[in-house]
């Protein structure tokens, strides 16, 4: 409730969403997600990676850990969504650069997993 269409990054330290764009570019998202059906999607959840941060903690394995963590988080989101009666599936293919541009990701942050949620 109270969430309007747009792009909302989550800031984990503040535990809040902040709207950074009020317009959702549906055609651009469809292209970036390589034809994934979005007609019934209410939410696209994009879990991003910060490999440099993970590598600072874990060395060369950090990049792999970042990918694994995104996958684990996506799995938990999928389980929770189904438990709430929502349709949920991971977008298996997408253009990294297109998704990053639509989200306005800074250099060094990359989309790892896109989860489509709806009814």
Regions found by a protein language model. Name each.
Residues 1-119:
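Acidic, surface-exposed loops and disordered segments
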């Amino acid at each position: 409730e109270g969430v309007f269409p747009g792009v909302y990054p989550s800031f984990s330290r503040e535990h809040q969403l902040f709207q950074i764009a009020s317009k959702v570019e549906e055609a651009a998202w469809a292209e970036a997600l390589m034809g994934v059906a979005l007609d019934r999607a209410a939410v696209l959840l994009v879990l991003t990676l910060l490999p440099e941060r993970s590598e600072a903690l874990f060395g060369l394995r950090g990049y792999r850990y970042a990918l694994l963590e995104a996958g684990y988080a996506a799995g938990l989101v999928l389980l929770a969504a189904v438990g709430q009666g929502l349709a949920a599936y991971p977008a298996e293919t997408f253009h990294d650069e297109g998704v990053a541009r639509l989200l306005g990701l800074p250099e060094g942050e990359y989309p790892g997993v896109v989860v489509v949620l709806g009814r």
